[in-house]
Design a protein with these regions (language model features):
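Glycine/tyrosine- and acidic-biased, solvent-exposed loop/turn segments at the edges of beta-strands
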Residues: 20-195
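Bacterial N-terminal signal peptides that target proteins for export
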Residues: 1-8
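Bacterial N-terminal signal peptides
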Residues: 9-16
């Protein structure tokens, strides 16, 4: 009886191991981080899919897990990222770990605004912004607009350009120094009352 059980266990293990790998070709997948349909070509092995994933206007090379999380390198992959106080939907080119931007890359919003730099666990750490939506509370007033320039974890850092409108709807631009997310040092402020 014991020999039969061992033989049965060995055969079952052999069947399970050989059944864990299956070649897939052009199978559509629905990815969990957005409602995107993609084509995958590769081998399913123990819940992971190593190989290329092609979507509408984007591609990925690496590993796709059974939970539809990507780890590897992507180009224009739809995802979310935390950008200095707000979570944004967009596309990402660079390294992904478990479906999140991680390492050096470029995150682009639907508006065309972008952040190029370092990410960690889906959060932007430091780099350069181009027309990134930004809100500044300064001197009891709220200023909303876009920022172009260097960013660190606390916000704008160094020389940058911020333009938009204040709470009263008046247009302004600030081209100058920033430190810790606040205007600092020399710069030029233009608003519609001063022009």
């Amino acid at each position: 009886m014991k020999k039969r059980f061992l033989l049965f266990s060995a055969l079952l293990s052999l069947l399970l191991l050989t059944g864990c790998t299956k070649q897939l070709t052009d199978k559509p997948l629905t990815l969990s981080f957005s409602e995107e349909t993609a084509v995958f070509t590769g081998t399913l092995s123990k819940g992971t899919y190593p190989g290329p994933v092609l979507g509408d206007g984007w591609r990925f090379e690496g590993t796709l897990t059974a939970e539809c999380l990507l780890t590897g390198e992507g180009e224009n992959v739809p995802c979310r990222a935390a950008l200095f106080g707000s979570v944004e939907d967009g596309t990402y080119t660079g390294s992904l770990v478990s479906g999140m931007p991680d390492g050096e890359g470029v995150f682009t919003l639907a508006s065309g605004a972008s952040f190029t730099g370092e990410f960690s666990g889906g959060t932007a750490v430091r780099g350069e912004a181009a027309d990134l939506p930004w809100t500044l509370l300064h001197g009891g007033s709220r200023f909303s607009g876009t920022y172009t320039g260097p960013l660190e974890s606390a916000g704008p850092e160094g020389e940058g350009l911020f333009g938009g409108e204040n709470a009263a709807g008046q247009q302004f631009t600030w081209h100058g120094g920033w430190s810790g997310g606040e205007t600092a040092g020399p710069g030029v402020l233009k608003d519609e009352h001063c022009i």
